[in-house]
């Protein structure tokens, strides 16, 4: 289309000037759009402290990892200290599943996740509690993940009937045990009574009072030692902390001041090599991987098995969050069987699981039995 000058006597250069003016107008008029598009990806207004994020988080499918496989050339579950003929060559899949959590979203970003994906939008406080921050939650999740690894090993050893012992993981500075008990000591007895797991020590200390003396039998690098400790009073900040590993009996009760972990007593060591994963929900699958590697045959029965669930040291399987997203991730990864904690079964039944079989489990023993029965074509308890 051609444009004419309003004045027939205008010089030939007039239309050119008008065209430049229009170009400038269009360019300047586009600036708000460009700025708006740029702001969509910003969490604060440039040059200010104005926060553009919304108090919501998006939860969706996370990656899955085969606990029988390798990551970057390293076994996800690495077992050492065992004879080669005891370590079973495993194959197949026992995949742990994860949930991807996205925070610090702007309103357009949140709406985009909600409209264009299968993510679930939840209040931010369900992911990052009030009076906390992302860094604190990350530390807590890392600690929970480490705890799940320890529990997975203990539960697997119990299932396999292998002996356990209690190792000192840390000694609180200034605690009654400080200077007497050392990191890596193995506590073998309390006042002459044999102990095998941290709970045995905690129970024995809990029966005493501040000021009492306790005699600990200790294996220190293969050398048998006896140490006597005068118990103190539990600090207020530990009162009611049911997850603390320290040997305590409640506020005002006897306090030793050591953090303990159970480990195999026959020299077996289990190392878990997944990085940047948090939370306790991998416990069941880690424990199954240890059982599978230390027993003949394949728990998967040649199928692609995935699952989730926390694990306690006694083998109890607990519920987790994001079950529908984990089922979806497993289905998309090609799994044919998914292990579901009993506490998640009703929610799992509503998920789009495709042709996957959802096995309901509440203990490690039960999970092993369910996989064995399913492989044989026997009836098993399923969700839904």
Predicted segments, located by residue:
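Terminal peptide-recognition signature
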Residues: 157, 177, 184-187, 191, ...
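Hydrophobic membrane-insertion alpha-helices, especially the h-region
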Residues: 26-44
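Conserved PDZ fold ligand-binding element
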Residues: 177-200, 204, 219, 327-330, ...
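Terminal targeting segments of Actinobacterial cell-envelope proteins
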Residues: 1-24, 115-124
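PDZ/PDZ-like peptide-tail recognition elements
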Residues: 52-86, 97-101, 117-172, 235-307
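Short, glycine/polar-rich helix-capping loops at beta-to-alpha or helix-loop-helix junctions
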Residues: 340-351
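PDZ-domain C-terminal substructure recognizer with occasional recognition of PDZ-binding tails
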Residues: 203-252, 350-374, 379-384
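Glycine- and Gly-Pro-enriched alpha-helical subdomains that act as flexible
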Residues: 280, 293, 305, 313-338
């Amino acid at each position: 289309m051609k444009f004419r000058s309003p004045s027939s006597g205008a010089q030939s250069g007039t239309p050119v000037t008008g065209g430049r003016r229009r170009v400038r107008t269009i360019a300047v008029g586009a600036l708000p759009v460009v700025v708006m598009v740029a702001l969509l990806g910003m969490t604060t207004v440039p040059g200010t402290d104005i926060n553009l994020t919304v108090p919501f988080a998006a939860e969706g499918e996370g990656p899955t990892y085969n606990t029988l496989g390798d990551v970057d050339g390293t076994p996800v579950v690495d077992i050492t200290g065992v004879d080669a003929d005891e370590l079973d060559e495993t194959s197949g899949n026992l995949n742990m599943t994860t949930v991807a959590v996205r925070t610090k979203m702007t309103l357009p970003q949140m709406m985009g996740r909600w409209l264009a994906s299968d993510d679930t939008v939840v209040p931010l406080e369900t992911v990052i509690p009030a009076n906390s921050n992302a860094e604190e939650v990350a530390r807590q999740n890392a600690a929970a993940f480490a705890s799940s690894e320890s529990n997975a090993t203990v539960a697997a050893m119990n299932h396999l009937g292998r002996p356990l012992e209690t190792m000192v993981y840390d000694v609180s500075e200034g605690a009654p045990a400080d200077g007497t008990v050392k990191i890596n000591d193995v506590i073998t007895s309390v006042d002459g009574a044999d102990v095998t797991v941290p709970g045995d020590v905690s129970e024995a200390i809990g029966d005493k009072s501040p000021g009492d003396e306790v005699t600990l039998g200790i294996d220190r690098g293969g050398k048998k030692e006896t140490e006597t400790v005068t118990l103190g009073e539990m600090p207020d900040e530990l009162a009611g902390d049911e997850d603390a590993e320290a040997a305590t009996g409640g506020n005002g009760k006897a306090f030793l001041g050591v953090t303990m972990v159970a480990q195999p007593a026959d020299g077996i060591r289990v190392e878990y090599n997944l990085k940047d994963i948090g939370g306790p929900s991998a416990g069941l699958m880690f424990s199954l991987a240890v059982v599978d590697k230390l027993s003949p045959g394949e728990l998967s029965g040649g199928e692609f098995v995935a699952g989730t669930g926390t694990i306690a040291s006694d083998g109890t399987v607990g519920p987790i969050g994001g079950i529908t997203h984990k089922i979806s991730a497993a289905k998309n990864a090609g799994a044919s069987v998914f292990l579901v904690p009993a506490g998640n079964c009703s929610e799992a039944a509503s998920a789009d699981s495709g042709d996957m079989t959802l096995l309901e489990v509440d203990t490690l023993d039960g999970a092993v039995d369910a996989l064995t029965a399913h492989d044989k074509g026997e009836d098993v308890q399923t969700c839904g």
